[in-house]
């Protein structure tokens, strides 16, 4: 069993861990039945690394997204855009920067790996991302060997583990424009507009971006536009963000996602 100890809680079984995690025939030096690896998460939830101090080699920040329960620490020039991509993508239902530390055996030794990003898509797929400016930043062969060991372990959990480069994160020029505009409205107040939206969503599944704005609040389309941006971030409205979001752009209205899984770092 893979164990997930919090800093102030006793170890607990990792949810849904397949039993073959305790079979260590392919991992020399471990006793049969011992955990293959150990995952550490914050005992209070959210990021495991707080980025406190002044000795960091990269640009650092802590960002807030009202859709998520915890702050989002970023390190390096690619993690900030990755956080914004997750925040604005209507197909991503949950994400957390710096979510866990994994201690895993590889190449005759044991290494510690802190995940840059975890997210869950609307279909329930769990993705763990190694965020880099480019694949050239993966560095030395020993680090690549550690990533390969992490990949083998996370694959056993049914998770997906992939590098994510800055160019992939930013996407097309149109997506970059949409991401910036939508992210600006991440804290738009929509509570009083939700009953109106639910009535609209119960009647129609597809409409245009402009028509939805006018339906939500015809008297204040500026506020309604911000509300639709927030609904995109919530996944309640889907739009193709690789094309400029114009009044005639098609959008789909969706029910709240039920696919987001309970994760030890959520």
Language model feature labels by segment:
Residues 1-266:
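Electrostatic, structured charged patches in enzyme active sites and in nucleic-acid/phosphate-binding
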